[in-house]
Amino acid sequence: MNLKIYVFLFCLIIIQQISAQITLQADGEGNTYELINSVLANPNRNVVEVPDCNHADFGRHITEVFDNELNKNVFQFHIHVSPDNDRCKVGVDDRQRNEIKTYGDSPENLIARNGETVQYKWKFKLSSDFKPTASFTHIHQIKSVGGSYASIPMITLTLRKSSPDRLELRYTPTNDQNTLKTLNLDELRGNWVTVKEVVKFGDAGSYSIEIRKTLTDEIIFNYSNPSVDMWQDGADFARPKWGIYRSLNNAQDLQDEIVKYADFSIEEINILSIDDLKKEAENIVLFPNPSSKQIAFKNINSQNYDAIEMFDFSGRKISIEKKFQQEKLDVSGFSKGLYFIVFIKDTIRVKVLKCYIK
């Protein structure tokens, strides 16, 4: 009997670990809304926010298609400058929306409560001639439900017409949004990119995001803040949104668009203690050492650090943001001598490696 109980508990743990990560993947043409709702909503509920009601002759505004670059089926989010609107809401004619989300009628493990840490992952691709507006074109949001600040997202990825056009990472715990970092939109146009976003929800929270080109694994955007308010007062829960939500205030700057998305993932994760992280980091090694061209890292786990920094022997920080790719560091062109490579997690230095450039 005890053995049966043990086996049952072991299987239960395995099932919980497997079900902790929820994925949404396109599976081919047809029944797209039904597929999305089967994953992100409770039975007979709807998380799809589309402009079909005002553009019925086009049909469904989220479809599926086979993508030759990824060699798999993907989602296509369609938006038209006219006549698409925001779900036929009366009096709202200055914006249009085609989004999916989680919400109160989603399974509990798809919404974020105060104190939880959640990892969101997805892929997306803009057209090679994508045109943003000077107002806003949101393609991702982390938004609260409940409380006095529910109308404004805590985190937004928005596309903006500028010189040059750019992606903006925007943040607020209240109602005063600030831009944290930007990226030239040409880095995204015509490229599949993979996004990983980790949020520790709470007044003493943390936030990180990384965007890589999917086909080359090149990091083109990253941001991390280990100590930031990630909970809006009075909120019941927080949830993600993906798709196209854009202003029509400068409609002359816009065009009909298709934004492709793939491989959505929502996973609640347990954060290791700093001592655990240091133990994990003990196994990290670099080779060859000394080197004059490229250094590779062994036993590296990106979940165990927020950032990697490099310092020369005098303590001067060396920029390596564009030199670190696919667990390899390009050191060609560096002056000869001793350098220090530092792995950081939650502002704590969990590993320091000596690196000799010859």
Predicted regions located by residue number:
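C-terminal outer-membrane/trafficking sorting elements
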Residues: L277-K358
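Residue-level recognition of short loop/turn positions
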Residues: T216, S273, S314-R316
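A general lysine-centric signal
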Residues: K4, K241, K354-I357
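Low-complexity, Ser/Thr/Pro/Gly-rich disordered linker/stalk regions
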Residues: Q21-V193, V199-I271
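Generic marker of residues within folded, mature protein domains
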Residues: F10, D67, A112, G147, ...
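Bacterial Sec-dependent N-terminal signal peptides
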Residues: M1-I22, I274, V352
